[in-house]
């Protein structure tokens, strides 16, 4: 909740992408697929999905984008405000040592944010998309089908949390009863590679629901073996 509440401070705007902006979604999905080691869909697939399902709001591509100027202005204002507090606390430095230390940590944190904003603006401009979600809605349920992030800046601006919090509020206001975070591996071992995905989805207060599952019927075992080999080779090249 604390992270999600940083939306206004960071100048984050969550909105629906238009048809001519689908490449924004594709770009962040591609970056995420390389980082996570899965095969991303081609741009044409996402465009076909949009064409078939967006008219009735069944499918929406959502983006969280940062306003660099707004965020910098807020961080600078925060530094100025805290610096004045520290100046006042320094009048009785010995008794306020703990608070002074905490305030200086916050100042340093905001200075790092400004440093990241300078890099971000130089590389990508003033309005920068950092997180995307493919949202599907049907009946009484909203499904977070796909999600992608710019990992280089995720640590500083928390857009993966902000976009989810905003979409949960959106879906609640639209009358949906459930927000489905979609799949997890079912491996709840804290040492497993997939545990982070589970904790990320669980932190919003959701419940784990086990569905019927799926099975594979191999029509051609040779083709299936070739596919598995090629998939493994593809993932190795991505690493």
Set out the residue ranges of the language-model regions:
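Short alpha-helical interface patches
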Residues: 19-26, 30, 44-52, 161-172, ...
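Acyl-donor binding region in acyl/amide transferases
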Residues: 128-130, 137-204
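Residue-level detector of anion-binding/catalytic polar loops
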Residues: 13, 177, 207
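Residue-level detector of family-conserved "landmark" positions at structurally sensitive sites
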Residues: 17, 43, 181, 211-212
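Glycine-rich loops and low-complexity Gly/Arg-rich segments
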Residues: 38-41, 87-90, 157-161, 168-171, ...
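Low-complexity, flexible helical/coil segments
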Residues: 48-54, 98-101, 171-173, 180-182, ...
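C-terminal catalytic domain of photolyase/cryptochrome flavoproteins
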Residues: 159, 183-239
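A conserved beta-strand-loop-helix scaffold within acyl/acetyltransferase catalytic domains
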Residues: 1-154
